[in-house]
Regions:
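ATP-binding pocket architecture of kinase catalytic cores
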Residues: 34-145
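Juxta-kinase regulatory segment immediately upstream of eukaryotic protein kinase catalytic domains
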Residues: 1-32
Length: 145
């Protein structure tokens, strides 16, 4: 088995905020109003953007080369085959001299994590089972693509 080592490109939280403004202006043709760092992991960073016209989106920056095609493809597959709502990809942008990493913008879907929601603990056993069935069905649909 061939194992490749993926090297993450350097990208600070502060840089992502400025880069999000640039990407939104270039790709959507409008100014970003409020930008807020959401979080990140080994290979990505996410920024919440509220445009001055009210549109909300998330810009995800990919710190590993050639990840954008896979991520965009996976989101499209999920949108097609999954029973859960998946954000639409609004734009993709290759890294260049202005923004050195690939990024894409996607629709922002409001919601909370059900994993730690107090309400999930308080609902009845039947409703918790129904929720678990929905999650299982969605996971099965995703892995059957």
């Amino acid at each position: 088995m061939k194992v490749e080592r993926i090297e993450a490109l350097p990208l600070t939280k502060e840089q992502t905020l400025g880069y999000a403004r640039i990407a939104v202006r270039e790709k959507l043709g409008k100014p970003a109003g409020n930008v807020r760092y959401m979080g990140g992991g080994s290979f990505g960073r996410a920024v919440s953007v509220q445009c001055t016209d009210g549109q909300s989106l998330v810009v995800k920056f990919l710190r590993a080369k050639d990840m954008m095609e896979k991520e965009a493809h996976d989101l499209k597959l999920l949108a097609k085959y999954s029973t859960v709502r998946v954000p639409d990809v609004l734009f993709t942008r290759r890294g260049d001299e202005k923004i050195p990493v690939d990024c894409y913008g996607m629709e922002r879907i409001e919601g909370k994590s059900s994993l730690f929601a107090l309400g999930m603990l308080l609902i009845g056993k039947k409703r918790r089972k129904e929720f678990a069935d929905q999650v299982t069905t969605a996971l099965h649909a995703i892995h059957s693509c």
